[in-house]
């Protein structure tokens, strides 16, 4: 009887050990779950400490409560999955989260999605590093109106390869300054946004306008909510 009991105990122990080993192997082999990795939150105290005095400047007039933090996944040019984070206005948070999810599922390459605060809210440094971002508070030059990035209602994607450019008094303005090689929009190069691009299609389907369609200047990286809609949301910002 005692011998049979020991056999049962040993068998049970072996079974539990096998189960534990199986669970550990499964956990070690797991990859990021897209459903679990795409989420949003309010601007917590911890997040606020990261942006205070940088993208959320001391003179920021936009309530902290109007912003949302997004956690996403994206794929780089090598097909590697990366984690990303972005801050946008609550009015567009669900749309942007869905757009970035669809881009990830399509393996659309985005090199970096980091808060601009990693660059001390310096747009030029962020763009030169080909970083994709959204919220960065600032007023429109010589006005008291907040810019669309300052409201968190504009998103820039793959910024080095999709620069901003304008001719002023016969001279070309280029941002970032290191993007001259990507001014020729007929050339073939990675990360380029045009009318056939999935990024363009998804953002415009969600009601955004593309800076590449502007006539007086071109901002190929830039997607924004139309001014008329913003005036409804923020009538005081006129």
Report residues per predicted region.
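Positively charged n-region of N-terminal signal peptides that target proteins for export
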Residues: 1-5
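C-terminal motif of bacterial Sec signal peptides marking the signal peptidase cleavage site
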Residues: 15-18
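N-terminal, intrinsically disordered, polar/charged segments of Gram-positive cell-envelope systems
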Residues: 20-56
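Active-site acidic/histidine clusters and adjacent loop/turn architecture
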Residues: 62-127
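Residues that flank catalytic or metal-binding motifs in active/ligand-binding sites
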Residues: 66-68, 131, 150-153, 199, ...
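Structured segments of extracytoplasmic/periplasmic soluble domains
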Residues: 73-75, 93-109, 138, 160-163, ...
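Mid-length scaffold segments of soluble, non-membrane domains
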Residues: 110-111, 125-160
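Catalytic cores and adjacent binding grooves of peptidoglycan-active enzymes
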Residues: 140-143, 158-238
């Amino acid at each position: 009887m005692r011998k049979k009991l020991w056999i049962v105990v040993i068998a049970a122990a072996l079974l539990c050990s096998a189960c534990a080993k199986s669970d550990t192997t499964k956990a070690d082999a797991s990859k990021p779950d897209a459903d679990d990795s795409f989420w949003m939150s309010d601007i917590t105290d911890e997040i606020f400490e990261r942006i205070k005095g940088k993208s959320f400047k001391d003179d920021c007039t936009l309530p902290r409560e109007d912003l949302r933090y997004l956690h996403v996944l994206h794929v780089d040019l090598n097909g590697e999955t990366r984690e990303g984070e972005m801050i946008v206005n609550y009015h567009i948070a669900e749309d942007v989260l869905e757009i970035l999810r669809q881009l990830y599922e399509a393996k659309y390459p985005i090199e970096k999605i980091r808060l601009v605060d990693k660059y001390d809210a310096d747009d030029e440094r962020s763009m030169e590093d080909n970083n994709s971002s959204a919220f960065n508070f600032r007023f429109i030059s010589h006005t008291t109106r907040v810019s669309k990035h300052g409201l968190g209602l504009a998103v820039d994607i793959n910024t080095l390869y999709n620069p901003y450019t304008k001719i002023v008094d016969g001279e070309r303005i280029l941002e970032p300054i290191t993007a001259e090689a990507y001014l020729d929009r007929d050339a073939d190069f990675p990360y380029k946004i045009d009318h056939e691009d999935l990024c363009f299609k998804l953002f415009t389907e969600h009601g955004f306008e593309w800076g590449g369609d502007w006539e007086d200047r071109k901002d190929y990286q830039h997607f924004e909510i139309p001014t008329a809609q913003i005036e409804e949301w923020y009538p005081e910002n006129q």
